[in-house]
Amino acid sequence: MLHFLVAVILLQIDSSRCGLPFYNGFYYDHDKGNGNGEIHFNGIRLVVETPGDPVFTYRGANVTLSCHYHYDPQLDVPRRTRIKWSKLREDSTSDQEVLVAAGLKHRSFGDFRGRTHLQQDSPGEVSLVIRDLRLHDHGKYRCEVIDGLEDESGIVDLELQGVVFPYQPLHGRYMLNFHEAEKTCREQDAVIASFEQLFKSWEEGLDWCNAGWLADGTVQYPITQPRKACGGPALSAGIRSYGERHKNLHRFDVFCFSSSLKGNVYYLAHPQKFTLEDAKQACQDDKAEIAKVGQLYSAWQFLKLDRCDAGWLADGSVRYPIVSPRAKCGPPEPGVRSFGFPKHGKYGVYCYKMN
C-alpha cells in the first residue's frame, strides 16, 4: 500500500511539472467530466465519415459500404481502435451484429459469416465488404469506431433494386399474423417489404386496397387512385396506415419484396395443359422447378418476361406477367395478373431454372 501511494504522488508531481495531466497517448481533461466517471478527450475529436446517399445494388452482387475515420487535429502516433459493424433492425430492436475487428483480427456473425471482411486500403478506412448479397441484407448499417472511451459512428443505407408485390395466401384475405407473413414471403423467394420499399413502389404506381404487414410491424397499403372503398375519394393519394399492430393477434395480408434472379423463369410450352401436380413434374422433367411468385415478379421486373398465358406457380396460384398491355391480356396497365387459386382446371406452368 505504501509503494502504491508513493507511485501516485510521484505521478502527480511529474504531471504538475509539465502543467498537464498524466499522458498515456491522449491528453485527458478530468475537469470536463460529467460527474458519472466519464473522461473526455481534450482538444482531440474522433470523426467517422460515411456516404450520405444510399448504396443501390442487386441480390447476388458484391458491395462495399464505405467508412473512414480520422482525428481532428491529426495525431502523430497511430491509435489502436476497435471496429464494429452492425445492422439496424426495421422494428428498432437491438442491432444485429455483422462484424467486429481489432488490429488484424476480425469476426463475422450469423448469416454474414464467410461473406464479409474489412477493406482497409488507405489510412483510416474501415469499409465493410459483403459478398453474394441476399434479400434480407438490405437496410441500414452502422459503422462504429471505438477508441477507449471515445465512440463515434456513421450510418450507411444499403438498398436492393427490386419489386414489391402484395400477397394473399390460399386460405383467404387477412389471414396472416406478422410471423406468418414473414414466413409466407420467404416461401415465395422474397422477404417482407420495408416501408421505404413500399413507398418507392407507390411512387412507381403500385395501387392496392388491401392492408398488409411491413417489416417494421406496421400495417399499410398504397393508393394512387383514391376511391370510396379505399379510404374515400376525399383523401389524397398516398400510403394509408393502420399503424403498428400486435404481431401475434392481428391478421392482414403482406407486402413482399424480391430482387434480381440467379436463374431464368420461362413458360413451359406443351400441347396439353397441366394439373398442379402434373405441372410440378413437368418442370422437374425439364431439369427445373416450378416457379415461385417472387421469382415470377422478378422475371417480369428485371427480365421483362411478357406472356399472355396463364400458368401454375409453386403456391398453387395461377398467374401470368404482362409488360406490354394488349387486348385479351387483362387491364391496360403492366403487371402480374392473377387467376387466384383454382381448385380445378388445367393450365400451363412457369418454371425456374438456375443459371
Model-derived features with residue positions:
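Extracellular disulfide-stabilized recognition modules
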Residues: 161-179, 209-212, 227-274, 309, ...
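Conserved hydrophobic ligand-interaction patch in extracellular adhesion modules
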Residues: 178-205, 267-271, 276-307
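N-terminal V-set
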Residues: 72-112, 196-198, 294
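Extracellular/luminal immunoglobulin-like beta-sandwich modules
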Residues: 27, 32-35, 73-81, 144-162, ...
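Ligand-binding face of N-terminal immunoglobulin V-set domains in extracellular IgSF glycoproteins
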Residues: 113-156
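Core motif of extracellular immunoglobulin-like domains
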Residues: 67, 85, 141-143, 185, ...
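Conserved Ig-like domain signature around the intradomain disulfide
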Residues: 63, 137-144, 252-253, 347
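N-terminal signal peptide
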Residues: 2-48, 163-165
